[in-house]
Swiss-Prot record:
InterPro entries: Expan_Lol_pI, Expansin/allergen_DPBB_dom, Expansin_CBD, Expansin_CBD_sf, LolPI, RlpA-like_DPBB, RlpA-like_sf. It comes from Cynodon dactylon. One of its GO terms (biological process) is plant-type cell wall loosening. The gene is CYND1. Residues 159-240 form the Expansin-like CBD domain. This is Major pollen allergen Cyn d 1. Keywords: Allergen, Glycoprotein, Secreted. Residues 39-145 form the Expansin-like EG45 domain. Glycans are attached at N9. The keyword Nucleus does not apply. One of its GO terms (cellular component) is extracellular region.
């Protein structure tokens, strides 16, 4: 039975049984992405565009996991009301919701909520406002050729570097990020700042280029040498040559 207390954290187990959750949707555009600024508590700014395409969700704490659940992928489906197709659709976690209405709660974009409907019944399903859905964690897949990217956040400097990690396939979510500056022989752990953003506040100035090591929830590691150049700039995206499972 669904209660109003959060359930156990959802971990990276695949092929698992379907669990039950409550679903709502948010945003001023019932057919579009949400939130209205196309951002959210994970730190993304473009959830209306590929590869998210507006198919996004706010998870409550067992799903969001204080930001460590950002980017995780879920199949969702509904059986009732009659407008539900019963066919699973894929959503990615890009935001957090704080409503204690169920053990598990997906606050979906209007587009994602409507995607659970039979063809042509999307608007009717959205009129339900709230329903029970079934969900399960699945591996994240991105279009062929998509590589992991690093967005250096505004305000970063030689004594404060913040990275937003995007487009990680497989587990989707990252549980550790380590950085190796030019003048270091060892990787230095970064701290989880908020959402999908990781930061480091070194005592001595940082000097690039920087190598980055990522660890996924399932324990997979990727290392990209010198992915961030010596002349890096804030509010800039740097694309790696790597992808989990590639």
């Amino acid at each position: 039975a669904i209660g109003d207390k959060p359930g156990p954290n959802i971990t990276a187990t695949y092929g698992s049984k379907w669990l039950e959750a409550r679903a709502t949707f948010y945003g001023s555009n019932p057919r579009g992405a949400a939130p209205d600024d196309h951002g959210g508590a994970c730190g993304y700014k473009d959830v209306d565009k590929p590869p998210f395409d507006g198919m996004t969700a706010c998870g409550n704490e067992p799903i969001f996991k204080d930001g460590l659940g950002c980017r995780a992928c879920y199949e969702i489906k509904c059986k009732e009301p009659v407008e539900c197709s019963g066919e699973p659709v894929l959503v990615k976690i890009t935001d957090k919701n704080y409503e204690h209405i169920a053990a598990y709660h997906f606050d979906l974009s209007g587009k994602a909520f409507g995607a659970m409907a039979k063809k042509g019944q999307e608007d009717k399903l959205r009129k339900a406002g709230e329903l029970t859905l079934q969900f399960r964690r699945v591996k994240c897949k991105y279009p062929s050729g998509t590589k992991i990217t690093f967005h250096i956040e505004k305000g970063s400097n030689d004594h404060y570097l913040a990275l937003l990690v995007k487009y990680a396939a497989g587990d989707g979510n990252i549980v550790a990020v380590d950085i190796k500056p030019r003048d270091s022989d060892e990787f230095i752990p970064m701290k989880s700042s908020w959402g999908a953003i990781w930061r480091i506040d070194p005592k001595k100035p940082l000097k690039g280029p920087f190598s980055i090591r990522l660890t996924s929830e399932g324990g997979a590691h990727l290392v990209q040498d010198d992915v961030i150049p010596a002349n890096w700039k804030p509010d800039t995206v740097y694309t790696s040559k790597l992808q989990f499972g590639a």
